[in-house]
């Protein structure tokens, strides 16, 4: 699911996933392995993503990737293990930990919308790694909850909040905002 969502809109991701669940039922490594790359592509998945998804399913089936062992690992260990898979980078590993494994302390520096929400809440033009890590420490061990709030803010959940990154657009509006403290 997380590989499918890479670099596409949330709407497109949900559409593809819904189509897969409707046609295939429960999505398991066995189900994925039974499909050809071309069959996966018919759901709207790119050739590369189809190959990555098939490869991950095959590694689970062969025992090369033991899903159960991930449950006892630290977030850092899980991330390291997941990025060994083709097509899985840090952002995808973090999204898997957050949404599939329900890890409580995930705040992704690589997620543009999340960082945008953070800029909006704290009125920064830029959030560098050092500042991001300071905020993450503030939210630990429940940074995943902060992720959900920052995404909501970036998506417009709080009327009047603005992004402080300069776009150099003469049509940018200056609006009042409500300060949100998490």
Locations of regions flagged by a protein language model:
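Short alpha-helical scaffolding segments that buttress acidic/His motifs in well-ordered protein cores
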Residues: 3-4, 53-57, 96, 146-150
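Catalytic DNA-binding helix-loop module of base-excision-repair DNA glycosylases/AP lyases
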Residues: 4, 74-119
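Alpha-helical ds-nucleic-acid-binding substructure associated with the helix-hairpin-helix region
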Residues: 8-9, 13-86, 138-140
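Long, compositionally biased
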Residues: 63-66, 80-81, 121, 163-173
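Short, charged, surface-exposed loops that flank catalytic or proteolytic processing sites
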Residues: 124-129
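Long hydrophobic alpha-helical segments typical of transmembrane helices together
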Residues: 133-176
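Conserved small/polar residues in nucleotide/adenosyl-binding loops
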Residues: 178-182
């Amino acid at each position: 699911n997380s590989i499918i969502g890479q670099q596409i809109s949330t709407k497109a991701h949900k559409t593809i996933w819904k189509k897969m669940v409707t046609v295939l039922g429960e999505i398991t490594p066995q189900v994925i392995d039974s499909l050809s790359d071309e069959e996966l592509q018919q759901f709207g998945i790119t050739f590369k993503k189809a190959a990555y998804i098939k490869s991950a399913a095959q590694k689970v089936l062969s025992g090369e990737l033991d899903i159960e062992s991930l449950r006892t690992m630290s977030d850092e260990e899980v991330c390291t293990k997941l990025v060994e898979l083709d097509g899985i980078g840090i952002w995808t590993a973090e999204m898997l930990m957050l949404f599939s494994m329900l890890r409580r302390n995930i705040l992704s520096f690589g997620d543009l919308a999340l960082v945008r929400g953070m800029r909006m809440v704290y009125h920064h033009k830029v959030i560098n790694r050092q500042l991001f890590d300071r905020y993450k420490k503030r939210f630990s061990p429940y940074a995943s909850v902060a992720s959900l709030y920052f995404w909501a803010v970036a998506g417009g959940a709080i009327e009047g909040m603005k992004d402080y990154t300069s776009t150099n657009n003469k049509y940018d509006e200056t609006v009042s905002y409500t300060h949100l403290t998490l």
